[in-house]
C-alpha cells in the first residue's frame, strides 16, 4: 500500500503543484484590494454600488446565500461569499475528478498499470489508498491557496484583516466539501462503468446542494439540508480595521 501511495503522489506532482501555486497567487488580489483606501474605492466600492440593484432582488440574494449585501464587499465577505463557498468546492471537486482520472490514464500510458496490478493489494486497499490521496490532495491545495492569500494580511497594513485560526477552520470545511463532491462523482461514474459520467454526477450533486441550500432559507421543506450541507461554510471572522 505504501508503494502505491508513493506512486499516486509521484505521478501527478506537477499537476498538484500547478493547482496549489497558481491558485494561491491569483487569490492575492483579494487582500491586495484592501491595500489602501484609493485601491479599495476603485476595486471594491465601485463594484458594490454598480451591482446594488441586485440586493433588492430577494430571489437572487437567496440563491447566492447573501443576507447582507454590504458585508459581501468586505475582506471577510470576499473570502467567504466569493471564494470559500462557491469556488473552492467547485474547483476542488473538478480537480479531484481530474486527478483520479489522471492516475488511471497515466498508469495505462506509461506502462505502470501492470505495476499497480501486480501489487499485493485487495480492491478495498486500492480504493482506500485513492481515498487517502484524494483527501490529502484537496486539503493541500486549498490550504496552499488560503495560506498564500494570507501573506499580505499578515505582512502588510491593510484596511481590513482576518484572523488566521477561523480562516483555517473555514478552509478545512470548504476543502472537505470539494473533495466529497469530486470523490462521490468519480465513484458513481466508476460504478456505471462510464468515467465521463463522473462529471455529470459530480456537477449534479453540487447543483443539488447549492439549490437546496438556497431554498432552505425561504422554504421550510428544505430546512433539513442546512444540517447536512457540505458547503455550509462558517465565516472566518468579522473584518476589523487597522
Language-model segments: which ranges?
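Terminal transmembrane helical anchor/hairpin motif
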Residues: 4, 11-12, 24, 29-77, ...
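Secretory targeting signals
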Residues: 32, 128-181, 185-186, 190
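Hydrophobic/aromatic residues in alpha-helical transmembrane segments
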Residues: 96-100, 112, 148, 183-184, ...
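Transmembrane helix boundary and interhelical loop/hinge segments in multi-pass membrane proteins
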Residues: 97-117, 131
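Residue-level detector of conserved catalytic or cofactor/ligand-binding positions
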Residues: 232-242
